[in-house]
Regions:
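Metal-coordinating catalytic core of metallo-dependent amide/deamination hydrolases
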Residues: 108-179
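Active-site gating loops and adjacent loop-to-helix segments of metal-dependent hydrolytic enzymes
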Residues: 51-84, 164, 174-179
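Short acidic/polar active-site loop segments enriched in Thr and Asp
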Residues: 99-100
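Charged, low-complexity intrinsically disordered terminal segments
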Residues: 103-106
């Protein structure tokens, strides 16, 4: 069985024929194309734990009251089954052809453990955030803002010592000087 059509490469689209049985790829094709092939998408900023929350978000809240430390989102996360929300988000991710995602995980070790029993055919990088003064719960840090520079710096240092990544929300609500 063969597939024929444009394949997106680092040099742009190239017409190719692909033997689906042995994955051999040859230049060009005859006849009509079967479609196009593009690399899997990457989403480097997800919050899969809130997937099911978005349909119930009050419309009249400020950003601070919505996602602040004691905001609506954190109360929602405490009251609801986060695993169900993550599974719903993963189904969307799979349907959209996303092969790599970075997910900001609230809730410390418990927040990271939600992924222990969830299968995903791609790559998930979890950006953990400690709760209640605990240490960085994994090797990667998900920083909510630069407002508290000392805590952010400590988390970034801990992640780097573990060979991890650091993801940060920057200037979502107000201008923050990244320098």
């Amino acid at each position: 069985m063969f597939w024929k059509g444009p394949v997106f490469t680092k040099d742009g689209f190239r017409n190719r024929t692909i033997n689906l049985e042995n994955c051999e790829v040859v230049e060009g094709f005859d006849g009509e194309e079967d479609g196009i092939i593009v690399p899997l998408f990457r989403n480097c900023h997800t919050h899969l734990g809130d997937t099911l929350a978005r349909d119930t978000v009050p419309k009249d809240l400020s950003l601070e009251k919505l996602v602040g430390p004691d905001g609506w989102k954190h109360k929602w996360l405490e009251k609801n089954n986060i695993e169900d929300s993550v599974v719903a988000g993963m189904k969307e991710v799979i349907r959209s052809g996303t092969g790599l995602l970075l997910d900001f995980r609230e809730g410390g070790k418990e927040g990271l453990s939600v992924f222990d029993n969830i299968e995903y055919p791609g790559t998930v990088i979890l950006l953990g955030r400690p709760k209640n003064g605990e240490e960085l719960p994994g090797k990667n840090a998900g920083i909510s803002s630069l407002k508290d520079v000392s805590i952010s710096a400590d988390l970034a240092t801990a992640a780097r010592k573990k060979g991890g990544l650091v993801g940060i929300h920057h200037s979502e609500n107000e201008r923050e000087d990244i320098d």
